[in-house]
Amino acid sequence: TAALAGYILEDDLEASLRYLAEINEAGFNLVQLNKDLIHYLRRVLALKFDPQLEEVFKRELTPDEITEIKKHLSLVKDPNKVIDLIKSLIRAYSEMRYSPFTLVPLEIAIIENLKG
C-alpha cells in the first residue's frame, strides 16, 4: 500500500498502473488494497494538517510505517488534490465491491487523478 501511495503522490501514473497490474496478476484482493490505500492516504493528509496526530498514529503503527507516512507527507504539495483522490478512491471502492471487474474502477480513479 505504501509503495502504491508513493507512486500516486509522486504523480507517477505509469508506475501506479504497473503496480496495480502486478498486484492484480498475483491474485491480491484489490478491494482490500483500495480500502488500505484510502486509510493510508487519510493518515498522510491528517498528519499534514495536524502533526500532533503522530502520537495517536504511534499507538497503531510501527515506527517504520510512521517514517514512511512522513516521507510521503513531504510529497503532498496540494492537499486538495489528495482530498479529491481520496473521494475518487471511495467511489471506486463502492463500485469495486459489486463489479466483476474490480481492477477497472480503481484504475480509472487513479488515471483521472494523475493524468497530465
Language model features: what each stretch is:
Residues 1-116:
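Extended, largely alpha-helical regulatory/partner-binding modules appended to the mid-to-C-terminal parts
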